[in-house]
Amino acid sequence: GIGIALVANAKGYKSTIVMPETQSREKMDTLRALGAELITVPAAPYSSQCHFVHTSRRIAEETEGAVWANQFDNVANRRAHIETTAEEIWNQMDGKIDGFTCAVGTGGTLAGVGMGLKAKDENVTIALSDPHGAALYEYYAHGELKSEGNSVAEGIGQGRITGNLEDAPIDRQYRISDEEGL
């Protein structure tokens, strides 16, 4: 949302960001300071039509001229990391990379960097670092989307396979504490 608000502000576009009301006050204040209209909704599971992703889609469909970025399922997110982030990491490391890990929000960074690095060297290990309370660790370890516990780490800890995560080359998964994640 912050990236969208930054670009929209610079280009003179209106931006509307929909997010759960459980997000931090600092994030909300930053978005507003960047000129975004902020709509907060109660936290809800993805299966609910009240989930912030579904709410944002509906608002975009009902607003003339609106573009729905859908950063979770729009694979342009992943592609940007294949074409830029992975290239930057590869070049800065002179191609000497054993592995890459990160937590998942949209899935774009992990999947995109993973795909980009694996295209250069299939032996690079790609690992998911998932906080307690998130479901992806269980999915990649045991094939079941199941979450136990909770986390205060904001913006990470996905509970579904997003469009960006589909076909992600994840070799390992780690359960991490909030302290490790932050």
Where are these regions (language model features)?
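Hydrophobic residues at beta-strand termini and immediately following loops
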Residues: V41, A69, I156, I176
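Phosphate/diphosphate-binding glycine-rich loops and adjacent basic-rich segments that engage nucleotide
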Residues: R58-A66, N70
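Short, intrinsically disordered, charge-balanced linker/junction segments flanking boundaries
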Residues: D171, D178-L182
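Glycine-rich phosphate/pyrophosphate-binding loop at beta-loop-alpha junctions
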Residues: G3, K11, Y46, N74-D171
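Hydrophobic beta-strand scaffold residues
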Residues: S15, L38, V67-W68, I126
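Active-site-proximal loop->helix
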Residues: I2-E61, H132, L136-L145, I161-T162
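Short, conserved active-site loop motifs that form the nucleotide-linked donor/cofactor pocket
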Residues: A36, A66, I170-D171
